[in-house]
């Protein structure tokens, strides 16, 4: 998948030092070592595409790539309104970026798919994490999703197994 299901707090806390190369199974892989709730660390594999995006984000800020910046450099920042390239995003800044993106997509869908537009306008940063969990649980074992999301209990992950209203309606109508 292209997403990692990170919490908002993990996204804004993420630093270049979190990007590592580690042995996973029989090969070396790039990963992000996420510092989650309770300062627990979990390791999630990164694709070359994801590494390229992170590298490009740093370069767009006028910094070197992943290999050329101090380890405590935030992975993401808001450069609008005088933002500084070495200052990380705030929770409010992340929310505004995500909400702005959803709003621009909702505007495009307004006439052709008004219900989808309304859903996007109501979406939040946590909705992205929720979407990751729901999608991941259709493809992966619940224990893998639990570990990826940093849940202490499989019952927390299990909450995402509840069918969406639309999915249940479609299934029962068959």
Predicted regions and their residues:
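Short pre-functional
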Residues: 1-9, 31-33, 135
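Alpha-helix N-cap/helix-start motif at helix boundaries, enriched for small hydrophobics
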Residues: 5, 9-14, 145
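Helix-turn-helix DNA-binding elements, focusing on the entry/boundary residues of the two helices
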Residues: 8, 142, 154
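Conserved tyrosine-mediated DNA breakage-rejoining catalytic core shared by Y-recombinases
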Residues: 13-72
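Active-site/catalytic core of tyrosine-dependent DNA strand-transfer enzymes
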Residues: 48-119
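Short, basic (Lys/Arg/His-rich) helix/loop patches that form interaction surfaces
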Residues: 95-147, 166
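Catalytic-site neighborhood detector that most strongly recognizes the C-terminal catalytic loop/helix
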Residues: 149, 153-173
């Amino acid at each position: 998948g292209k997403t990692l299901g990170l919490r908002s707090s993990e996204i804004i806390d993420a630093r270049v030092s979190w990007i590592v190369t580690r042995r996973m199974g029989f090969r070396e892989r790039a990963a992000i070592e996420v510092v989650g709730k309770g300062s627990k660390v979990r390791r999630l594999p990164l694709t070359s595409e994801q590494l390229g995006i992170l590298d490009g984000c740093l370069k767009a800020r006028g910094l070197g790539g992943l290999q050329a910046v101090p380890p405590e450099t935030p992975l993401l920042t808001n450069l609008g309104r005088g933002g500084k390239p070495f200052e990380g995003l705030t929770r409010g800044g992340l929310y505004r970026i995500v909400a702005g993106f959803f709003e621009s997509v909702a505007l495009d869908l307004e006439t052709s798919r008004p219900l989808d537009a309304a859903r996007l306008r109501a979406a939040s940063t946590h909705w992205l994490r929720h979407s990751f969990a729901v999608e991941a649980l259709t493809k992966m074992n619940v224990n893998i999703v639990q570990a990826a999301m940093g849940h202490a209990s499989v019952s927390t992950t299990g909450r995402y197994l509840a069918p969406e209203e639309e999915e249940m309606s479609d299934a029962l109508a068959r």
